[in-house]
Amino acid sequence: MKQQANLIRAGQVIEHDGRRWTVLKQQIITPGKGGAFIQVEMRDLKTGNKTNERWRTADTVERLLTEEKEYTYSYMDGDNIVLMDPETFEQTLLPLDLLGDQAPFLQDNMVLVVNLVEGDPVGVTLPAQVTLEIIEADPVVKGQTASSSYKPAKLSNGVKTMVPPFIEAGERIVVRTEDASYVERAKG
């Protein structure tokens, strides 16, 4: 399906130069002189290579339609993750690199959304937030109360994040899977 280049968004799958690409980032740039253009960072679905491409905003690109299907995460198998189809109970093997930076947030029995193009997996979406335990938290530095200060902490999955000063080691917090940022204390 053809669409204007200025409508490209992260997560979409497009066809360019006879290859399939998943869009990682996009930015519309309007220079002081000349027409606006869109800068797109994308990854080749076959090779995994990244590239940057520029189009004028009026150009058209071929967008591929993706189908979303829910799977349940089972376990890791080397550089792959094993997912189970909750309807048929069939197991599917996907490369871990489809998750990118979100891989450490995988939890047993987590429901993932797999994006498929013509039956081939092209991306995996995790839930927006997960609950994890703080295993290490720096002590509060006295006198840093004038502004909203955060301190470094290490989560149970090994990821480091910044948390408010009242959070201590052993507490459970909710973090965003997108950027590992603190959301709130876990309830219950």
Curated annotation (Swiss-Prot):
Cystine links in this protein are none
User: Quick one: where is this thing mainly located?
Assistant: cytoplasm
Quote the subcellular location field of this record.
Cytoplasm
Question: Could you tell me which pathway this protein works in?
Answer: Protein biosynthesis; polypeptide chain elongation
Q: Which GO terms describe its cellular component?
A: cytoplasm
For this protein, the record's PROSITE patterns field holds: EFP
Name the Gene Ontology biological process terms: peptide biosynthetic process
This entry's Gene Ontology molecular function terms read:
translation elongation factor activity
Keyword Metal-binding attributed: no
- UniProt keyword annotations, A-Z: Cytoplasm, Elongation factor, Protein biosynthesis
Q: What HAMAP family does the annotation carry?
A: EF_P (MF_00141)
Q: Which family does it belong to?
A: Belongs to the elongation factor P family.
Xref: NCBIfam families:
efp (TIGR00038), PRK00529.1 (NF001810)
User: What is the role of the protein in this entry?
Assistant: Involved in peptide bond synthesis. Stimulates efficient translation and peptide-bond synthesis on native or reconstituted 70S ribosomes in vitro. Probably functions indirectly by altering the affinity of the ribosome for aminoacyl-tRNA, thus increasing their reactivity as acceptors for peptidyl transferase.
- For this entry, the protein name equals Elongation factor P
Q: Which gene encodes it?
A: efp
